[in-house]
Every structure is written in C-alpha cells, then in structure tokens.
Amino acid sequence: MKRTFQPKNLKKKHKHGFRSRMSTKAGRKILNKRRSLGCNKLCA
C-alpha cells in the first residue's frame, strides 16, 4: 500500500508558505501569533 504522505515542496510552499500566509487576514494572524511566541521559523 502507498503511504499517505508524498512530499512535494511546491505544494508545501503554496499551502503553508510565507506569501500564502500574508495573502489572507487569518494567515497574518497566524504569523503574528508565531512572532509573539518567539518562533524562529514562521512558515514552511
């Protein structure tokens, strides 16, 4: 049986990347939350 996770970098960037997070209001909220938590890595 094929595994469910077949990694693709472009798909990852489109879904969870910085620019996709910046493009929506909810995404910007996520970024601000992660900044306030002090995360070194904000996005994928």
Swiss-Prot record:
Single GO biological process annotation from the record: translation
One GO molecular-function entry: structural constituent of ribosome
Extent of Basic residues compositional bias: 1-19, 26-36
Ribonucleoprotein recorded as keyword: yes
Coiled-coil regions, chain positions: none
Any Pfam family hit: Ribosomal_L34
GO CC, one annotated term: ribosome
Annotated segments matching region Disordered: 1-44
Keywords of this entry: Ribonucleoprotein, Ribosomal protein
The family this protein is said to belong to: Belongs to the bacterial ribosomal protein bL34 family.
Name under which the protein is recorded: Large ribosomal subunit protein bL34
Source organism of the structure: Wolbachia pipientis subsp. Culex pipiens (strain wPip)
Gene that encodes the chain: rpmH
